[in-house]
Amino acid sequence: MNGPPRQIVIVGRDAALWLSATVLRQALRPAGVSVAAVELPSRLSMSSAYASLPPLEALHAKLGLDESALLRSTGGSFSLGTNVVGPADAAPFFLAHGSYGAPIDGTSFFPYWVKARHFGLGAVLEDFCPTAMAARQGRMLLPDEATEAFGRTDYSYHLPALAYVAALKVRASRLGIAVHHARSVTVELESDEISAIALEDGTRIAGELFVDASGADAVLIGQALGEGREDWRPAFVADRILTAHATPFASVPAYAETRVGDTGWLTLHASQAATHITCAFASDLQDDETALAAAQTLSGLKLLDPVLTPIEPGCRGRPWSANCVAIGSAACAFDPLFDVDLHAIQLGIVHLLSLFPVSGEFAAERAEYNRITRSAFERVRDFQSAFYALNRFGAAKFWDAARAAASPAEVAHKIATFRARGDIAPMEDESFAPDLWQALFVGLGGVPESWPPAIDRTPPERMKEEFRRILGFVRDKVLEQPAHDAYLRSLCRSEAA
């Protein structure tokens, strides 16, 4: 190949396939790049839902996906973060898609809060977060100039998966993507690279760059190219996941809720269409039938259409191998905690676009892509691992094993730095903001032993004044916000009209 790739062939299923196809086609069509999508059988069920992180909103905007139309067609909802509910002796805490506090005298808020807590402040960290407080009061938080000046006020989505994929397919059709359907494919190799994909009916689809979006099957990068995988299972206890759905809540909360049980955890994702349930557990501690009964008890809901599947966290040594780029779980499979799968798909696509080859020789782009994506995936893994390592959820066997699991060295370093002075050790390619890490550590019972001495220059009365100002801003701003249900109804109704 003399010039840059002009023919991209994507083999896969579900969101990984259709997000890859639509984003690459939309971005590269002006350069004359064609995209062919080979769709394998879906692995989704009626119970499946995609929970996003905030960056997906911007990706949708670039694709020309109208937010109100998407939420109406999918029956989706907004999410302002995750409420974590532990045992009775552990206070719930909120991981918000927004800032905790605002800077004081040019310094981040958190060390002032730590100092104040040492001197008896009763207000918890989330009291200073408009996003968390809006969610707890059943409201949506709409960004404006005041909230932008305060800090981040982001949101994400809960999207019923089958309907979301259908919406992406409509967009793909409008972009002129060539679509083929196959139950299985044969991968043709030439000089250790992929040259074409052969379908069961004899159709042969040649390409210059191939994308593996086939999920855990890793049809191209794993089965055909033999690219190895680093096993992350030693850091995670759960090896089975149960997904199910229940009837929608009468009032749809603007957040996910993770509930901790003795044998694992369960997350509820509320949408307009249904309540989607994800439950993670360890098969050596609980069989499938017992897990289903436990999930029903912990959720308090009648679970419909349960599906049980294995989970094997791990990452490809090289997500881009030869002329094949793996996207989604073909590249990296995560523990299901905090619903990062859709975000991982987006990370892979965005970095591929930023490093798309400019010539037929793309070894440099490939090496940089592998460095960046591996680093980004590891930072996401670290956030999940920290939840398990620091859990204070009692002496149940699952949580004992989680605390004893082999956490990555980066997690231990972050924990040690936080405990010493409340700081979050900065690392490249983070997906989660420092104050979200701090909220996680505080929520799990972490209390820094001290704070940076530079903040001692701020007089106590000045600190108190700023705390009162921030709490007043949060209270007033939240009271201005519409109820989440009402906002969803108005948004979807205006689109229908």
Language-model features: where?
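Conserved mid-domain beta->alpha element of the FAD-binding
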Residues: G314-R379
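Dinucleotide-binding Rossmann-like beta1-alpha1 core, especially the glycine-rich loop
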Residues: L44-A134
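Long, low-complexity C-terminal extensions of enzymes
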Residues: V358-A497
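Glycine-rich FAD pyrophosphate-binding loop
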Residues: R25-S48
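N-terminal Rossmann-fold NAD(P) dinucleotide-binding loop
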Residues: L17
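Conserved FAD/dinucleotide-binding core of flavoprotein oxidoreductases
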Residues: G261-E312, C332-A344, L355-V358, F362
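Beta1/beta-strand and adjacent pyrophosphate-binding region of the FAD-binding site
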Residues: G3-D14
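Predominantly flavin-linked oxidoreductase catalytic cores and closely associated redox partners
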Residues: T147-A291, I349
